Amino acid sequence: MILMRILIYGAGVIGSLYAALFAEAGYDTNIYARGKRLEALRNNGLKYKKNQEVIKAEIRILGELPNDDIYDFVLLTVRENQLYEALTELKNNKSNTIVTMINSLDSYNKWEDIVGKGRILPAFPGAGGSINDDGILDAALTPRLIQPTTFAEISGNKSERTKQFSEILRHAHIPYQKVTDMHLWQLCHLAMVVPIADAYYESDNPEKVEKEWKIMRKTAERLKRNFNFLGSIIFFVGLTLPRYRFSKPSASLDMNLR
């Protein structure tokens, strides 16, 4: 293993989980936090549940980020509405690669206009969970079949840093996939998750929404509409839908509409 310095910018559920996993794998792991979360981390450290035990991660906790504090990879794990503030804060830092683990359809050019061309590596996390009232992380990676950590160069080309990032994830036992068009992948991802989220919020009993036929039918109709719309546009511009998730979506959804 090549020793890498990693900064996690954002200490919510996603950032905290990746920080814990990178630290377990032996990487020089640092996490940047603010406000109450920073105070909690400084007082108690980053604690997380694993196999019914509470473990304290071996990481460095930061409340500020000097420009000359350089990392091999900076993982940006903030909410979308915090993205531009974070990019502005990172623009003068000398680290070369910022992995934007954010669900956003904004133009990557806008991000590069802030931090500089060639620094952005778009990505999407594969994890979920919560932080309880005691500040203890209870989270897990999503299975590879459902949602691996996904990333790509903006150009779609392979690069030395995508190879290095793959190795980091592999060594930390984090499922991942490299795609050729991250923006297209996120479009497809939203086409799927928005109808599912709508079903959750429309139900009076979200935990058993799968038993509500009317909502499930509406969800299937929305999914089919989204995929057909995406497919028609992508066909028009000569692109290809990501194969791992979207092969022949209309046929499978037709079964749910009968």
Say what each PLM segment does.
Residues V54-D138:
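Rossmann-like NAD(P)(H) cofactor-binding subdomain of soluble oxidoreductases
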Residues N109-C188, P195:
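Rossmann-fold dinucleotide-binding core
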Residues H183-R258:
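Helical "substrate-binding/catalytic lid" subdomain
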